[in-house]
Amino acid sequence: MRVVTIVILLCFCKAAELRKASPGSVRSRVNHGRAGGGRRGSNPVKRYAPGLPCDVYTYLHEKYLDCQERKLVYVLPGWPQDLLHMLLARNKIRTLKNNMFSKFKKLKSLDLQQNEISKIESEAFFGLNKLTTLLLQHNQIKVLTEEVFIYTPLLSYLRLYDNPWHCTCEIETLISMLQIPRNRNLGNYAKCESPQEQKNKKLRQIKSEQLCNEEEKEQLDPKPQVSGRPPVIKPEVDSTFCHNYVFPIQTLDCKRKELKKVPNNIPPDIVKLDLSYNKINQLRPKEFEDVHELKKLNLSSNGIEFIDPAAFLGLTHLEELDLSNNSLQNFDYGVLEDLYFLKLLWLRDNPWRCDYNIHYLYYWLKHHYNVHFNGLECKTPEEYKGWSVGKYIRSYYEECPKDKLPAYPESFDQDTEDDEWEKKHRDHTAKKQSVIITIVG
């Protein structure tokens, strides 16, 4: 009996010990689980912690870096140098400093939209000679010069809209660059924010020379007259001063009539209009709007200094345009855009100025290779005097290293070809006129 009692007591003691030990075991297991859970939960925090590398991936065999919305203020040093595309949109970058991207020499596209960029230093894009796409829209850029883009000769797509552009003399070179015909995808939709007189004007359409010329500003905004007398209204020039010929083609001859402007009421069926040897020093918008059948227009020897971009609006059938022996230094962007069927363009004996503003005329002629022209020779500045405009433009780009030059037509000079063409054309014209005279006789 004693043995049975001892055995029962031992069982109760063992059970009591197990009961005491079990809560501790549960707590230890719980604590262990919490510790393990804490370690597992720390991984996502590290993944999104600031300072860690951005997403780098390859798509269609091209390497991308995606660092969007990371509150970055600068380029991180650990990024791969063989990147082809860099996405840095929606960050906090305020300044693009010199050599900021110089080690990414293979970069093709750079997305910097929706940052806080207000300043771009002159060598910020140094080394990006393969860059084709640059997105700078939705920033705080007010002033920028063409100098910034010297190191991106292959740039084909540039977005600048939704920036508070301050359209003054400081951005004149940028506007001139955007208005070159080959740059048709650079700076589209970008508009001036200030000053008030330029607000909402597109950078690609604004006249760059008006940004710096105070005299033209006074002409656009004349001061009110002090005198109480009404302004003198000069009579409009009427086309009845000119001679109208029907044979061999409908011709209006206004040659040597001392005209100071294009006459009104030009018959709409006129095919040839001769306004040479007058005193018309500028062509206003829509001067020939109603002369839809016009094919030959002679404006030589007038002293023309300025042609409004809309002056030739409506001349969709014009084939010959003579602007020789005037005072033209360059063409504003858009002057020739309506001349779809132009074949002959006479430009000799004008004081062509070889600077950035001459590029529009030259590249328009290169793009419209079926248009024969002559006389495109530099008169100023002195260092380029006597050069063909093609030679000047080639030298303009030769100042850059050869590996940074954009792809342009191999042939820039057309002088010899133009001289031969002009001689043949004059001989051919003389023969045609002699035949006509013989028939009339």
From Swiss-Prot:
<dbReference type="InterPro" id="IPR003591">
    <property type="entry name" value="Leu-rich_rpt_typical-subtyp"/>
</dbReference>
<feature type="repeat" description="LRR 5">
    <location>
        <begin position="293"/>
        <end position="314"/>
    </location>
</feature>
<dbReference type="GO" id="GO:0031012">
    <property type="term" value="C:extracellular matrix"/>
</dbReference>
<keyword id="KW-0892">Osteogenesis</keyword>
<feature type="domain" description="LRRCT 1">
    <location>
        <begin position="163"/>
        <end position="214"/>
    </location>
</feature>
<dbReference type="InterPro" id="IPR001611">
    <property type="entry name" value="Leu-rich_rpt"/>
</dbReference>
<dbReference type="InterPro" id="IPR050541">
    <property type="entry name" value="LRR_TM_domain-containing"/>
</dbReference>
<feature type="repeat" description="LRR 3">
    <location>
        <begin position="130"/>
        <end position="151"/>
    </location>
</feature>
<keyword id="KW-0677">Repeat</keyword>
<feature type="repeat" description="LRR 6">
    <location>
        <begin position="317"/>
        <end position="340"/>
    </location>
</feature>
<keyword id="KW-0964">Secreted</keyword>
<feature type="signal peptide">
    <location>
        <begin position="1"/>
        <end position="18"/>
    </location>
</feature>
<dbReference type="Pfam" id="PF13855">
    <property type="entry name" value="LRR_8"/>
</dbReference>
<feature type="domain" description="LRRNT">
    <location>
        <begin position="225"/>
        <end position="268"/>
    </location>
</feature>
<feature type="repeat" description="LRR 4">
    <location>
        <begin position="269"/>
        <end position="290"/>
    </location>
</feature>
<dbReference type="GO" id="GO:0001503">
    <property type="term" value="P:ossification"/>
</dbReference>
<comment type="function">
    <text>Involved in bone homeostasis. Acts as a negative regulator of RANKL-induced osteoclast precursor differentiation from bone marrow precursors.</text>
</comment>
<feature type="domain" description="LRRCT 2">
    <location>
        <begin position="350"/>
        <end position="402"/>
    </location>
</feature>
<dbReference type="InterPro" id="IPR032675">
    <property type="entry name" value="LRR_dom_sf"/>
</dbReference>
<feature type="repeat" description="LRR 1">
    <location>
        <begin position="82"/>
        <end position="103"/>
    </location>
</feature>
<dbReference type="GO" id="GO:0045671">
    <property type="term" value="P:negative regulation of osteoclast differentiation"/>
</dbReference>
<dbReference type="InterPro" id="IPR000483">
    <property type="entry name" value="Cys-rich_flank_reg_C"/>
</dbReference>
<keyword id="KW-0732">Signal</keyword>
<dbReference type="GO" id="GO:0048539">
    <property type="term" value="P:bone marrow development"/>
</dbReference>
<keyword id="KW-0433">Leucine-rich repeat</keyword>
<feature type="repeat" description="LRR 2">
    <location>
        <begin position="106"/>
        <end position="127"/>
    </location>
</feature>
<protein>
    <recommendedName>
        <fullName>Leucine-rich repeat-containing protein 17</fullName>
    </recommendedName>
</protein>
<dbReference type="GO" id="GO:0005615">
    <property type="term" value="C:extracellular space"/>
</dbReference>
